[in-house]
Amino acid sequence: MASSMCGMFPGQQPPGSLPPPGPGGPGQPGLLTGTPGNRGANNTLVDELEASFEACFASLVSQDYVNGTDQEEIRTGVDQCIQKFLDVARQTECFFLQKRLQLSVQKPEQVEKEDASELKNELQRKEMLIQKHLAKIHHWQQVLEDINVQHKKPTELPQGPLAFLEQASANLPAPMKPN
């Protein structure tokens, strides 16, 4: 697998070696090799992605646009930079999808292990989320219990000679105000 990624990142290609053939076989360009008119001899897909990303920002902060260039011209330039970035991003995604497909054909057990690992991680994440919610529920149940205890305390006061009158007057409606 590591040898099939050779050339994807700068400095990985052994000196004097030819780039690996593209996914279509010998004679067809791969996603990492230089295609005529598209990439320089030493540029990889990652280099091109980085360059197009930098070009997007450069077009947004360019002094040419600040010095009174037409708004439509600015929009066109930015759109072209963004479109190039998106195209290279799609090519990069395609490269990794092809590598994933090759891996699934060559080593299906590896893909199953990765899927099982992802499912275990998902279960752990959800279990932690459940524990977090249970802790919140416990906290709020405790708050409600404390409130209920506080409301019960006034009725548990020792009964004095005027306690009956105090309870009865608490249940009476408030007097009406004259209009």
From Swiss-Prot:
Coiled coil regions in record: 109-139
Compositional bias segments (type: Pro residues): 12-26
Short name of one Pfam family: Med28
GO cellular component, one term: mediator complex
Membrane-crossing residue ranges in chain numbering: none
InterPro entries xref list: Mediator_Med28
Family: Belongs to the Mediator complex subunit 28 family.
Chain's role: Component of the Mediator complex, a coactivator involved in the regulated transcription of nearly all RNA polymerase II-dependent genes. Mediator functions as a bridge to convey information from gene-specific regulatory proteins to the basal RNA polymerase II transcription machinery. Mediator is recruited to promoters by direct interactions with regulatory proteins and serves as a scaffold for the assembly of a functional preinitiation complex with RNA polymerase II and the general transcription factors.
Record text on subunit structure and interactions: Component of the Mediator complex.
Protein name: Mediator of RNA polymerase II transcription subunit 28
Organism whose genome encodes this protein: Danio rerio
